[in-house]
Swiss-Prot record:
DNA-binding residue intervals: 169-252
Record-linked SUPFAM superfamilies: Winged helix' DNA-binding domain
Name of the protein described by the UniProt record: Transcription factor Spi-B
GO MF annotation: an example: DNA-binding transcription activator activity, RNA polymerase II-specific
Keywords attached to this entry: Activator, Cytoplasm, DNA-binding, Nucleus, Transcription, Transcription regulation
Sequence similarity: Belongs to the ETS family.
Tissue expression remark: Expressed in plasmacytoid dendritic cells (pDCs) and B-cells, not expressed in T-cells or granulocytes. May also be enriched in stem cell populations of the liver.
Encoding gene per record: SPIB
Length: 262
């Protein structure tokens, strides 16, 4: 009967006694690619041995002969976004070819572009009328020529009247004053003083119209056409009416006594 003995430890090597009584060396079954327990270097992976020197030496590098060019055909593809320490989302460009399904973004030279100022449509400035372009401190002037137009003139009151006393002057009053005083006889004159009929001069009627415009303080030039329109409007109130004669008009009879007293 064979006696089984325990495995014997002989140094760093192990031996095992099998039932047939033959000892087998376990080290002979160990693969040569692994280091042993003593840390011996592997024969296949010997890192301490320097690599063999190639037979042909490397050519000397000549910086002058080397020519570098900008990779024009290289396409930029963007890797997955990364977060910078400041918390901003940034895209890291890469020179690798874009993967399938990822679009390639063409490079653009922004330095060669010329910036052009944006064109804006001119904003139309408001058109100022003749009344709006007056200075703010200028006195208000009357420009209408209807029969109700009245100019402010200094009142004929005496020294005891208040300063700045003014009264309204109407067109028929202006004409009555000229006819009564005999002013501007070359422009207007009596035809029948007792009946209150008067006539304008066809030659100097515009001069009389300008005088009335100055009396009113109009900025626009007064014409006889405007003055005649105001006289026709007086027919509604009865102060003056048109006579069937060229450039001839007649005052209302109620105004004649005032003319005689003047």
């Amino acid at each position: 009967m064979l006696a089984l003995e325990a495995a014997q430890l002989d140094g760093p090597h192990f031996s095992c006694l099998y039932p047939d009584g033959v000892f087998y060396d376990l080290d002979s079954c160990k693969h040569s690619s692994y280091p042993d327990s003593e840390g011996a270097p592997d024969s296949l992976w010997d890192w301490t041995v320097a690599p063999p020197v190639p037979a042909t030496p490397y050519e000397a590098f000549d910086p002058a002969a080397a020519a570098f060019s900008h990779p024009q055909a290289a396409q930029l593809c963007y890797e997955p976004p990364t977060y910078s320490p400041a918390g901003n989302l940034e895209l890291a460009p890469s020179l690798e070819a874009p993967g399938p399904g990822l679009p390639a973004y063409p490079t653009e030279n922004f330095a060669s572009q010329t910036l052009v100022p944006p064109a804006y449509a001119p904003y139309p400035s408001p058109v100022l009328s003749e009344e709006e372009d007056l200075p703010l401190d200028s006195p208000a002037l009357e420009v209408s020529d209807s029969e109700s137009d009245e100019a402010l003139v200094a009142g004929p009151e005496g020294k005891g009247s208040e300063a700045g006393t003014r009264k309204k002057l109407r067109l028929y009053q202006f004409l009555l004053g000229l006819l009564t005083r005999g002013d501007m006889r070359e422009c207007v004159w009596w035809v029948e003083p007792g009946a209150g009929v008067f006539q304008f001069s066809s030659k100097h009627k515009e001069l009389l119209a300008r005088r009335w415009g100055q009396q009113k303080g109009n900025r626009k030039r007064m014409t006889y056409q405007k003055l005649a329109r105001a006289l026709r409007n007086y027919a509604k109130t009865g102060e003056i009416r048109k006579v069937k004669r060229k450039l001839t008009y007649q005052f209302d009879s109620a105004l004649l006594p005032a003319v005689r007293r003047a």
